[in-house]
Amino acid sequence: MIIKSVAVLGAGAVGSYVIWGLSEKKDIRLGVIASGERAKRLKNKGCKINDTVYHPEVWTPEEAHGVDFLIVSLKYGALPGALDNITAVTGENTVIMSLMNGVDSEEIIAEKVGAEHLLH
């Protein structure tokens, strides 16, 4: 599989690190999934990482639907509220990687979208 589009759900410390690492990859379309005030803030101010401001694309879950690779980097407690967004993003060939703490985030996500989408 060639990865051409990556969405990050959760632009905190871990998600920002992913954004930093992928921002220079010109052959990958990179976006952060957000809505409401968070989306507005990310669009206007970007993500500041080590004194550098990055401006990844900001997508709603529906705009991100069908990305090649979804990175879930939420705090564990936010996962139940994000499952509908994860479902909205996941297309037929989307691969999901959880970078969350806890030992069962992959299983929780798999119950919603199917284990075939999860990278273990």
Regions found by a protein language model. Name each.
Residues 52-54, 59-120:
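Rossmann-like NAD(P)(H) cofactor-binding subdomain of soluble oxidoreductases
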Residues 1-50, 55:
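NAD(P)+-binding Rossmann beta1-loop-alpha1 motif at the extreme N-terminus of oxidoreductases
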